């Protein structure tokens, strides 16, 4: 049939990524055979070709669940969040289920998240996981929102039972490498194939066909049941919609071929009643068939020898009763298919004797046939969930900024899983949050060497190189990423970091803005833009960028930190304290945020609280020199020079090449009237190439130390 041919060609082109050709053929298909199924197929072609606007226009107004899901997805791609939500939830009372199952709830969760409705989005992501425990993206979103439950709970026994139930419902056969859905579809393909060959029936059968299609034989509401079949999310077959008028149950019901009928019942007897109820049962099967995918039935015809035996070359259905004795024995073929259950083998207290004997023989010959399959199923589910538990633990800890716990979780993985790109990226990010830039560099470098085509996380890698001041490596990385994908926001973030390291903030800002053009929801790019505006002392623009980042992700603590630094530089200390507090609520283990929060407290004359915050920062990360330096600064301002000297002497051992440490020691020795040591440390500070502004200040201090001695010498003369 023309419709079948075009539909198969469209699917083949989609599988081979020939999207434009698929669109062309699907437009022909829809013009010749207008139906909701073909409309959905064309929408998929448009979406595959990044033409969400085209899918939006052709699906607008569709009411079937699958069309609503595709329309909502198109709206989401076009940033029409209100229309997307309305398509997924047409009723305010939520009486109608969200189309798409787990995917529909996940999409609705994203819509709620980007609309600023955090609690609703959390609910939808949890619903997605309840529908499909393997919907990892939903768990990842929950981690990002800070609302994820422990992985052992999410991927525990309930998830295992859910997956087992789903697999049983889908009739997965692990041992034979094919699903029982395909076997069932091949049985139903028998009826479709028989119908499609009615043109080859001899003349007398043509007359019988007219008699068979008389209105008196049509069951009530048959058309209505087939045309409004509930629209399960599987795509119905357009072939079935075309041959509705032929009414396949009636064709088989009225055939006067006893031998053939017996053979047919030997195939479908596991779910067919006796002759009196044959039409009703087949009508129900036709209704069920309308919810199945066309591609699955076609695959079943190709793979299953049963369905192949009833093609155009197999005309044995039309033989006389005597000739039909030489037809292939279908009852002998039934052993190749799985028997569903003894309940389906009998109906209304009766069973076909031939079927019953074949089922009994099958059960006797293979009494524990399902045991290996069930064991394989349970074993496979257990392995998958065990892996997801480890990954989930690490991911959850990382988003809670418990980086040490995250690293310990990832170390439980096998070597194969640990060396995957995603895990190496997570490990690198964990070290990055710990400010262990050398280990972070090692992890990111390994990931980039093994997977040079993967760009996810490269923005963080470029920031690591920025902090390590690896200008040459950062420039090489930026060029490499741009050559791989110029349309990736991560690539342009790397370029921007390269220019920022060179103090070319204007060019860096343009690079980060280019990343935002490619992905408006790329939170880190907005934050980096804010940093560059702050470096240019354009604080209003910096604040605007940080606000945009927080509009996308309220748990992006870097933006809260950036706002705090902006207010701190503007001497708005109360506002700065509030922003640092919000940042600490998200990342309570950041010694950098604690340090600057302490500075804001100190500037507000809350010195005791400031000292406590500095000590907490030192305990959190003893390797970070910043809290120790500012602790000494606060002690110096309070006149406690000896404690400040002790802190700086310890810090000097950790950071001997830091000019600011020696300059601070020079000031303290000056206050303690140990002028020789003060001059020594000021000289060391100048030798370590401080910034021009710091160099001017250090020279001014040295002049104050030398000038009194000169005056004393002149007076003696």
Swiss-Prot record:
UniProt biased composition (Basic residues): 293-304
Pathway it works in: Protein modification; protein ubiquitination
Keyword Cell division: yes
Residues in TPR repeats: 421-454, 489-522, 524-556, 557-590, 592-624, 625-658, 659-692
Coiled coil: none
GO BP annotation list: cell division; protein ubiquitination
Phenotype of the disrupted gene, per the record: No visible phenotype. Cdc27a and cdc27b double mutant is gametophytic lethal.
InterPro entries referenced in this protein's UniProt entry, alphabetically: TPR-like_helical_dom_sf, TPR_2, TPR_rpt
Keywords noted in UniProt: Cell cycle, Cell division, Mitosis, Nucleus, Repeat, TPR repeat, Ubl conjugation pathway
PROSITE patterns: TPR (PS50005), TPR_REGION (PS50293)
Origin superkingdom: Eukaryota
The keyword Ribosomal protein belongs to this UniProt entry's keyword annotation: no
Main location class: nucleus
Quaternary state and interactors: The APC/C is composed of at least 10 subunits. Interacts with APC2 and APC10.
Function, in words: Component of the anaphase promoting complex/cyclosome (APC/C), a cell cycle-regulated E3 ubiquitin-protein ligase complex that controls progression through mitosis and the G1 phase of the cell cycle. The APC/C complex controls several key steps in the cell cycle by mediating ubiquitination and subsequent degradation of target proteins such as cyclins. The APC/C complex is required for the female gametophyte development and is involved in several aspect of development by controlling cell division and cell elongation. Involved in the control of endoreduplication.
Protein name as annotated: Cell division cycle protein 27 homolog A
Encoding gene (name): CDC27A
């Amino acid at each position: 049939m023309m419709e079948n041919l075009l539909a198969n060609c469209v699917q083949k082109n989609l599988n081979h990524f020939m999207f434009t050709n698929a669109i062309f053929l699907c437009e022909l298909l829809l013009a010749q055979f207008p139906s909701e199924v073909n409309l959905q197929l064309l929408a998929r072609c448009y979406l595959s070709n990044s033409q969400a606007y085209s899918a939006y226009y052709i699906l607008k107004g569709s009411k079937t669940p699958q069309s609503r899901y595709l329309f909502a997805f198109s709206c989401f791609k076009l940033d029409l969040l209100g229309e997307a939500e309305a398509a997924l939830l047409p009723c305010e009372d939520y009486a109608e289920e969200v189309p798409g199952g787990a995917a529909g709830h996940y999409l609705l969760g994203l819509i709620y998240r980007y609309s600023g409705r955090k609690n609703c989005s959390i609910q939808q992501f949890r619903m997605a996981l309840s529908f499909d425990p393997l919907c990892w993206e939903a768990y990842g979103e929950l981690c990002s929102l800070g609302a994820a439950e422990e992985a052992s709970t999410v991927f525990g026994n309930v998830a295992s039972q859910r997956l087992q139930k789903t697999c049983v419902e889908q009739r997965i056969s692990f041992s034979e490498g094919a699903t029982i859905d395909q076997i069932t579809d091949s049985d139903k393909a028998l009826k479709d194939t028989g119908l499609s060959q009615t043109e080859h029936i001899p003349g007398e059968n043509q007359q019988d066909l007219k008699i068979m299609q008389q209105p008196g034989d049509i069951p009530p509401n048959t058309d209505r049941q087939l045309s409004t079949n509930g629209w399960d999310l599987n795509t119905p077959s357009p072939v079935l919609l075309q041959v509705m008028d032929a009414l396949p149950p009636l064709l088989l019901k009225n055939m006067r071929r006893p031998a053939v009928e017996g053979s047919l019942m030997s195939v479908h007897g596991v779910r067919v009643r006796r002759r009196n109820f044959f039409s009703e049962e087949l009508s129900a099967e036709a209704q069920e068939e309308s919810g199945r995918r066309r591609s699955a039935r076609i695959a079943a015809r190709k793979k299953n020898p049963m369905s192949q035996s009833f093609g155009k070359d197999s005309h044995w259905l039309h033989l006389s009763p005597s000739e039909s004795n030489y037809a292939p024995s279908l009852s002998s073929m039934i052993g190749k298919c799985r028997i569903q259950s003894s309940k389906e083998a009998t109906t209304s207290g009766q069973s076909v004797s031939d079927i019953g004997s074949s089922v009994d023989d099958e059960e006797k010959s293979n009494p524990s046939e399902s045991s290996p399959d069930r064991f394989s199923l349970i074993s496979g589910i257990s392995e998958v969930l065990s892996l997801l538990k480890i990954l989930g633990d690490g991911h959850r800890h990382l988003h809670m900024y418990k980086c040490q716990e995250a690293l310990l979780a990832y170390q439980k993985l096998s070597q194969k899983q640990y060396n995957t790109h995603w895990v190496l990226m997570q490990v690198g990010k964990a070290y990055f949050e710990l400010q262990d830039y050398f280990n972070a560099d090692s992890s990111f470098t390994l990931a980039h060497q093994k997977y040079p085509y993967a760009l996810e996380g490269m923005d963080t890698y470029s920031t690591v190189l920025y902090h390590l001041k690896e200008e040459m490596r950062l420039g090489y990385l930026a060029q490499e990423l741009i050559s791989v994908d110029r349309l990736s926001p991560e690539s342009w973030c790397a370029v921007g970091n390269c220019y920022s390291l060179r103090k070319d903030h204007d060019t860096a800002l343009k690079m980060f803005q280019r990343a935002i053009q490619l992905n408006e929801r790329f939170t880190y790019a907005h934050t980096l833009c804010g940093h560059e505006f702050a470096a240019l002392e354009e604080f209003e623009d910096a604040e605007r960028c940080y606000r945009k980042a927080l509009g996308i992700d309220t748990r992006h603590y870097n933006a809260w930190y950036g706002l705090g630094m902006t207010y701190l530089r503007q001497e708005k200390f109360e506002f700065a304290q509030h922003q640092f507090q919000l940042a600490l609520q998200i990342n309570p283990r950041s010694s950098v945020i604690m340090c600057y929060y302490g500075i804001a407290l100190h500037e507000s004359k809350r010195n005791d609280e400031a000292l406590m915050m500095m000590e907490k920062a030192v305990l959190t990360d003893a390797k970070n020199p910043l809290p120790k330096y500012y602790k000494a600064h606060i002690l110096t301002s309070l006149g406690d020079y000896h404690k400040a000297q002790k802190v700086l002497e310890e810090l000097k051992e950790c950071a001997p090449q830091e000019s600011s440490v020696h300059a601070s020691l020079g000031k303290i020795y000056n206050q303690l009237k140990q002028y020789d040591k003060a001059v020594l440390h000021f000289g060391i500070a100048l030798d370590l190439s401080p910034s021009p502004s710091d160099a001017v200040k250090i020279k001014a201090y040295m002049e104050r130390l030398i000038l009194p001695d000169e005056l004393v010498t002149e007076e003696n003369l």
